[in-house]
A protein has these predicted regions:
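A polyampholytic, Gly/Pro-enriched intrinsically disordered region
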Residues: 104-112, 168-185, 222-233, 285-305
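A short, acidic, amphipathic alpha-helical segment used as a generic capping/interface helix at domain edges
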Residues: 226-244, 253
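Alpha-helix capping/helix-boundary segments
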Residues: 132-133, 252-254
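Short, flexible loop segments at boundaries between secondary-structure elements
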Residues: 146-173, 207-217, 262-300
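Redox- and metal-dependent alpha/beta enzyme cores, enriched for Fe-S-associated oxidoreductases
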Residues: 86-88, 163-168, 174-226, 310-314, ...
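Short glycine-rich phosphate-binding loop at a beta-alpha junction
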Residues: 124-130, 177, 244-249
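Iron-sulfur-cluster electron-transfer modules
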Residues: 1-134, 140-141, 292-306, 312-344
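Short Gly/Thr/Asp-enriched flexible loops that form oxyanion-binding sites at enzyme active sites
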Residues: 136-142, 255-265
């Protein structure tokens, strides 16, 4: 019902015209700044297999912080999961068209195409990463669209396989941590807390649940003053407990907090980083955090340029330096990034 209400409001007067086009280009740019060509192809190209018992559905915006997704794939591999990856704007769940642009027909066509792509792999389960996709597709399947597969969240799959996962944790992590979660979709936050509690040596001293179901434009950023207050309270709580680690949940949450490391006294890690470490491996490099901690847009372009060229992404350097602040803060969700709106 919430999505329907937002759709009706957006249909009357959208403040985010051409959002999907702008978002798609921003996502491709950000993924291209951080990934090697083989990785870039894996998360953006259509699946190569014709059948897979499990589909790991990335959604769109998670590709802005792609190291989380590759960490998640490492965990699936460690569990021996036979899966295929589907993601990127070409497999959008349709929430942007419906909820943000008010284009219900386009949103329906998009979600139907994505569900058809899932069905083409004949999966038993589809595991979603993105909370917005989880909500939108979940609501679509609840009485409106029948499928042959079970749709659920990646963290639920981890919780269901926790006994197996626990046996594979070979590296103790002597850390004190506070988990950042949300009031909305609280069961998913509890899944993460359960899995983290199984890591040897890790002391989860608190879970702080903020308003909304995620950080970012679809979540708590819609109330900026409340978001600012709750984010500050979370950082204070990490310091009060003496925890050295703030554990983030979703991609937007991770993006919102990584710069807190510049203040000193804490590390910002995603829960998937900790899982990979506990499994005895090195997490995928968090290039997003490395770039944000530089906090100099010319230097960020210097760092990103080899990745962009390797991935075949053409760019105008002065323009890129100018727009990167808006790209990183997802300004298209507040009507910005008009340079990405043209059809060419």
């Amino acid at each position: 019902m919430l999505v329907l209400a937002n759709t009706m409001h957006a249909g009357e007067r959208t403040q985010t015209p051409q959002l999907f086009r702008k978002m798609s280009r921003a996502i491709r740019l950000m993924a291209g700044m951080q990934l090697l060509p083989a990785e870039f192809a894996r998360v953006l190209n259509p699946p190569r297999r014709t059948q897979a018992p499990i589909v790991f559905y990335l959604g769109c915006n998670a590709l802005r912080t792609p190291h989380l997704l590759f960490n998640a794939m490492y965990v699936l591999d460690a569990l021996g999961t036979d899966y295929e990856v589907v993601g990127g704007p070409g497999s959008c769940c349709g929430i942007v068209q419906s909820k943000w642009e008010g284009e219900l027909g386009r949103g329906e066509r998009m979600i139907n195409a994505t569900l058809t792509r899932f069905e083409g792999l004949s999966p038993e389960k589809v595991l979603s990463w993105c909370p917005s996709c989880n909500l939108h597709i979940g609501e679509t399947l609840a009485g409106f669209h029948s499928t042959s597969f079970e749709f659920g969240h990646f963290t639920t799959y981890l919780a269901d396989h926790l006994d197996e996962l626990r046996l594979k944790f070979v590296r103790p992590l002597p850390l004190k941590a506070v988990l950042h979660a949300h009031v909305g979709l609280a069961d998913l936050g509890r899944n993460v807390a359960r899995v983290l509690a199984a890591i040897p040596g890790l002391q989860l001293v608190d879970t702080v649940a903020e308003s909304g179901y995620t950080c970012g434009g679809s979540g708590c950023a819609r109330a900026p003053e409340l978001m600012k207050k709750e984010h500050a309270q979370l950082i204070d709580r990490v310091r009060e407990t003496g925890a050295g680690v703030l554990v983030t949940f979703y991609h937007n949450c991770h993006a919102a907090f990584v710069r807190a490391e510049n203040e000193g006294g804490l590390r910002v890690l995603n829960y998937t980083d900790l899982l990979v470490e506990a499994l005895g491996a090195a997490p995928h490099e968090d290039v997003f955090k490395r770039l944000r901690l530089i906090d100099d847009w010319k230097m960020i372009v210097d760092e990103a340029e080899p990745y962009l060229r390797a991935n075949g992404i053409e760019f105008d350097r002065p323009l890129l330096e100018k727009i990167l602040p808006d790209v990183f803060r997802m300004a298209e969700f507040t009507g910005g990034l008009d340079c990405f709106a043209s059809r060419t």
